Amino acid sequence: MEERIKIFIERLASEQVGSLTENIYLDKHKRENLRLYLMALYKNKPTYMLVGEAPGYKGCGVTGIPFTDENEMKNHLGTEREGYYFENIQCLQKENSAGIIWGAIQARNDGKIPLMWNAYPFHPFKENKRSSNRKPNKTELIVGKSYLEELIDIFKIPKNDIYAVGRVAQSQLGYLGTIDYIRHPSYGGKTECVIGILSI
């Protein structure tokens, strides 16, 4: 399994992306953060999966782990001692969506960390503004689908245990049939998102 995860991450790093997208996995630290997260999950057998839209520039764009900013990574996954990399441990990056998602995960109080991924695993941004987020286009989502399918296969997550966080993720998961939808926490969706995760 470790070899499959290694190959998966190497494939991410080798993906050629467009001029309005950042391949965050060109960075060795983000690759290692993702590897540590996926290996920890494999050992602890996740019981459900959350699929979002794409990495945000304050969250996954910094850590390499979906729905996870540096603050949540330190609080719930590991510290530098465990091998996780932080750009500045004295001033941790925070993202609203990451805080909401992790808050709901902890509120479930089941001791389980879900497998988390995105419809498109690279960071799409607006023209002339790298520190921004952009909805992935159709071509990008086609690229993203192969990574999503591979990760689902690696972890053998049953269809009924996969949840779409947001409409982009719901559309991307359409090939599986009807998938449970959870509202994305951005743009006023916090309460509905939390309720959705708690109801899993």
Task: Locate each region found by the language model.
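Short, flexible loop segments at boundaries between secondary-structure elements
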Residues: 177-200
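A polyanion-binding, active-site-adjacent surface
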Residues: 2-161, 169-171
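Short active-site-adjacent structural elements
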Residues: 125, 171-174, 188-191
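Short, low-complexity, polybasic intrinsically disordered segments
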Residues: 132-136, 175-182
